[in-house]
Amino acid sequence: MKPVGFFFIFARGRFNSIKMLCKYVLTVAGTMYELPKSCIRNWDEIKRTLKRDGFGGVIRTFTSKFEFVGEAYELLLDEWVEKYLFADARIAIYEINNQHTYDIVINSKLDFGTFDNSGYTISMNTVDNSTATLIKANKGTQYEYLVDEIKAVHQLYYDRLDMQNILNFSIGDTYTVNPIELADVYVSSYSNEISKGGYLEYDKGEKGVVADLLGVPASGIKAYVEMDVEYENSGDAEYATFTLSSCGNTQAVNISKGETKTIILSISVSKASFDSYGQRKMVYFSISLKASHTTYAKINIKKIKEFKVTYNSISDPIYIDAITPTRVLNCLLKSINGGKEGITGKIASNYDSRLDNCVIVAAESIRGIPDAKLYTSYTKFVDWMESVFGFVPVIDGNIVQFVHRDTLFSTSIIKEFEVDHTEFTYSVDEKLIYSSIRVGYDKQDYDSINGRDEFRFTTEYMTGVDITDNKLELISPYRADAYGIEFLAQKRGKNTTDNESDNDVFFVGAADSILTSGVMCYKLIRTGWNISGVLNPDKMFNVMYNQRAMLLANSKYIGISADKLEFTSSDGNSDVVINNIALKDNFVISEKLATCGKVGFNTYDEVIPSPVDGIITLVKDEYLYKGFLSEADGQIERFDGLKYELIVKSISKA
């Protein structure tokens, strides 16, 4: 097609079912036959259509069924009888242009699997091997790819996430203590969560010893005790003392006879105090009694709320094979095309830095599994691109390009209709009206206290609109949870069984960098996204893929049915604040892409504008309708007008 649009050239006057100048070529077994129009029985039904895929790009399609009579009937019948399942034929339609030469409109193979002979007419469908049709047929198929065959030149340098290590302890319920010796307190551990060990040796079986310290990480080690204690009204001591100590750091709390109180003890051991301490390096807990003479006290531990030793640790950096989004897209398109080259995938750059600086990693690569594979489908890739970045596919011939949805709806006026139209209709598309929105990622169950810190799960908002109960789902099938990556990395080198996460796909915000060692790699991006409400803000990554950023990427589309979103719930940590904006804050939408209205009309204006991404205007009953092309179709040979459907942008007084 000419880039200036579809031009219809007429053989007769304008408003009388105009015949256009076309020629038909049937190719049978490699021989071309120019057919008279009379050989195609349904010549006046053949049409072409431009249709927008939702709020994505516009796709051109044509009539797929042809009815052959006369000479064409005989040629096709002979071909079928002679060659049976190996019969081969094509139909091509050419249309004259302004230069009085012919442009090809249709050139498709005929599908002998649909061969139907009525004795006078042979009906056959064309084989639609267009890119759009191939994708539609195979978009949900999951493919697997060896990471080694598709990985980028550089690896991802994963410098790890700070993890909180927790050792929980317990003691007995009742102690009898005297002033001469400490109570017989023996401490035992239970339900520990250790990401990186080697700092403590516990369960020693020695009175009062919580753990020996073998080392202290740079962030130090903390011990904390909180328990409800009763000093029974027995004996005549002055008071009992609960003490927690380590490497010269001590805290003590007294309790008097007959008293019940909550004892809280907290100490910290820095690496410096550990290194300089000259005696046994351990965490020690004791119960003692203060009295000037021989007596005793009975101490009851009513409830242990917390008795723990904690420290933050960070594991050694690792390198992970990474894949660019464009590479994944082209792998999928090649698979969809039967393993052949011929369909090219592109992703628009310089629109969203979050996408420009993004790489994909397979779960098996994070775990370091040999011959790691990436498991994904075209549908998952599309859903990821749309939900996280607001990017949608545009199919143009054999090129599939992902662009931001907003760029497909220009504010420039490309066509104006005033009175030159008929059969006007206006209606509301209720499918575009949403009462609530779910945005983010599927909830993951980590079985770890550190996982409570993760916030990249599903967040829900209300639009305030109650016309429908429709729910907009902006859920990415690819994962961005930092803790999910860390937990998989911790399994490296361990002989663990496979789990569901091994098939997952992750993505990270990373940029090409040079390490101090001189190695080129993808390095995690942490600057530009200030975060609070997490355990270690300085080491958190993938902050740019938070749910509010996803809403922002799709805000104009969401604006079709809402101007403000009210936070209702989150599956994860909802106390996060990013760049001084809380995840729980309401989300205000200042601009909408369009409205939920649609307009239909017919016109004898023969030119469909191109490009088709701008505004088309229409005047009806003194109102000016502005909208975007949703669909337009017209017959090729016998032109009887164009039928339009527009997505309404606005309505105003003309």
Locate predicted features.
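Internal alpha-helical scaffold/solenoid segments in large eukaryotic proteins
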Residues: 284-285, 383
